[in-house]
Each structure stands twice: as structure tokens, then as C-alpha cells.
Amino acid sequence: MLITAPLLIACGADSTHPAPYVQPLNNRLANYTVNTPLRMAHFLAQILMESDRMRTAEEYASGAAYEGRRDLGNTQPGDGVRFKGRGLIQITGRANYAALVKAFGLDYIAHPTWLEQPDDAVHSALLYWDSRKLNGWAEKDNVLAISQIINLGNIPRPGSKRQIPNGLSARKALLAKCKTALGVGAAVPVT
């Protein structure tokens, strides 16, 4: 299925921002086997949520909250701000930026703002999606698991302090819009 700006708007993208992402999405989705309407619906819903409906490829917050977060690889002073969320899925932390350097051969450590460019923003989101095997969860229509992996970094163990990802109800609403726009049946997502 071809991605168009009207399709992205029907999925919930802000009407003034999706055009720069259309060609990168069309160029790259199939390479990461985001190639069924259900997989596409889940992927698009998550990137719409993470990018404030394609209004930004840079996290609004300063990134100071990530300072010293060794779980993100932020081991040097200033890493939190330098490696705040970028791209359509908000890649966060020195370790995740370093993984992109290794995968793409582009120096995102020296040039973190490159992830704000449309092709890099899309490509980084797809690599993250693929590396976390999110197509499998999409095939199970499990919006909760996908949202936990993207927003919390993993599926929390029972009894963990934080179980519910930020904006879960908004993620579900975006998924419903994406399913409608892509013609996916009325399957009820796992919550």
C-alpha cells in the first residue's frame, strides 16, 4: 500500500506536517517488512504518537531528565540533553544513537540532530521497530506490548513500578484511526 499525505492525515497526522515523511516511508517500509495493513497501522500509530502527530522529530523536553541514565548509555556529562529523543520514534540515549551509527554508518554521535531529517527520522524508527521485533506484536494486534516496548523500553515484569506507557489511550485511538484508514478489519486490540 502506498503511503500518501492524505492517508497520514486520515491516520491522525497534523495536516500541515506529513508531506516530508511520505517518500521516506514509501522507500523504507517494505525493507523492514512493515508490509501488511495491520503492521502498518501499528507502526504508523506509534510514530504518530511519538512525533506529536508528525509535528516534531525532536523531543519537546530538554533531555535533562536523561542525564546520567546508564541504561540509555548516557555516561558522559551532557549526554541527556545531547541524545534526547529524536526521529519519529524518539530514539533516546547515547547507546541507541551508537546503534544507529553502527547500522547506518552515519555519525549520529557527532551530529545528533541529523535524526530530525525526514529520511533519518523514518529510517531510525524502522530500525528500532525491527530490532525490537515489533512486527510480531503487531501481528498479534497487541498495542499494549508495542507501547510498553517503545515508551518504557521493555515489557515490564509483573509487579514493576510502572506498567502503563504514556498516552496509552491516545495510542489506541490513533491505532483505530490507522486501521480505518488502511482498511483493517474491526479486530479488537489486546490491551
Where are these regions (language model features)?
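Extended serine/threonine-enriched, polar tracts that run as long, contiguous segments within proteins
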Residues: 130-135, 150
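Peptidoglycan-targeting cell-wall enzymes and recognition modules
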Residues: 2-20, 24, 43-128
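Amphipathic, Lys/Arg- and hydrophobic-enriched alpha-helical face
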Residues: 24-30
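Acidic helix/loop microenvironments that form the catalytic cleft of cell-wall polysaccharide enzymes
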Residues: 47-50, 138-163
